Amino acid sequence: METRHHLNTKMVPSYQAPLSKVTAADLTVERLPGCKYMNPSKKHILREEYRDKVKHIMYDPRPQEDLDAEYPVSCNKLVCELAAARKHLHFNPSETSIGIVTCGGICPGLNDVIRSITLTGIISYRVKRVVGFRYGYWGLSKEGSKTAIELSRSDVRQIHRFGGTILGSSRGPQNPKEMVDTLVRMKINILFTVGGDGTQRGALTIYEEAKRPGENIAVFGVPKTIDNDLAFSHRTFGFQTAVEQAVNAVRAAYAEAVSLNYGVGIVKLMGRESGFIAAQTTVASAQANICLIPENPLPKETVMRLIERRLQQSRNCVIVVAEGFGQDWETGTGGHDASGNKKLVDIGFILKKEVESWLRANKEKFPQGTVKYIDPSYMIRACPPSSNDALFCTNLATLAVHEAMAGATGCIISMRYNNYILVPIKAATSVRRVVSLRGALWRQVREITVGLSDDVQQWNEQDLRRHLESLNVERERIIARLASKV
């Protein structure tokens, strides 16, 4: 597991990383010992889906390209544990208290997850109580724990109709010992952490602290990342809703651009290090002409040439840009937010200024050129989930309760190859999933957007030359250092 943290995985899709770096131990979920309590649901007696035996799916079942066979099959021997309801439980339902905490930025589906965890615990397992901790991990601190609320069926029955989170949220870590002390003092047996990679890294510290002698606490993560960049997962809740809402923004930008003489519409979307929302919105809308994502860095000159090419073809241009693109275009203020995320420069505003300046410089060629800028990010994050995302949230939360009651801990619930699986938190937070520039999604983007393959290739070659030059400089420095020691 430790070798993964030394991998340089930035901008490299997780599935392209060598399988030799992922071991069976990395994907093995810890379970608290002993399952002596019977599931209170009578359905487990006859229903096959209530099982104690853990089933698995292959980590990567896709056919391997290097196999010379008429029907190639996967040679990957690594497996992931399938999530399911269990016949026997680790925790005695009538004596079990469940805790829920939501952290980080809001996202469509948070209330759905809170609702489903609460109702599954109360109705299916008849647990003693469900407690909601307010405003992120602060709610687990000694001071914040005073604001905790007990959740009932009536409290959560209708919350899925609204965006945001009824528990509130915040960024930033808290002392793990203090948080576990709160869980022990309030007699919480299972803590569900709903949040992104920063939240789950915090959950990992709670999980490690909860291992201290005499404690019997399960820590279970429900991952929330609207960017859809979670490792070992092909889908995270809120992502599909975000794409649907983002398409509306692109359509508005298109309406503005097409109504003007040489109109340019710019839409900035979420995506700090992964451009899944921008890429899928570009394909789904079929009205964006340029897609800019962090995985495909381009200089200002190339972007301006892309705009020029589009305006020459048609008197309008729509640009979709992910917030993490072009962070080298201007020097940022530096620093990090409370969650440890690097503060980004506002690429949407910068791009707008650059395009306006370029249009002024080319006024004779593109008279009356106008730029319209739309940033729908906070509107997207705050809306309730689509019906498909709501269903997904319910499935994730329900299975999370089933597995946690059976003693699964230190893991998250996710979807991979259309199966709900369990992944250890340490593995899930060790690498970020990004858009593959050689994959089908980016191929679709390239097919429907304007391109300057020669310019992009030239830029990539220049970047490679700069990298090689830096390596040569470093090599000469090492040789000189060694020579001085002789």
From Swiss-Prot:
GO molecular function, one term: 6-phosphofructokinase activity
Source organism, top-level taxon: Eukaryota
Enzymatic class: transferase
HAMAP family in alphabetical order: Phosphofructokinase_II_X (MF_01981)
Name the record gives this protein: ATP-dependent 6-phosphofructokinase
The species this protein was found in: Leishmania donovani
Name of encoding gene: pfk
Compartment annotation: Glycosome
Reaction equations catalysed: beta-D-fructose 6-phosphate + ATP = beta-D-fructose 1,6-bisphosphate + ADP + H(+)
Pathway participation: Carbohydrate degradation; glycolysis; D-glyceraldehyde 3-phosphate and glycerone phosphate from D-glucose: step 3/4
Subunit structure: Homotetramer.
Keyword terms: Allosteric enzyme, ATP-binding, Glycolysis, Glycosome, Kinase, Magnesium, Metal-binding, Nucleotide-binding, Peroxisome, Transferase
Coiled-coil portions: none
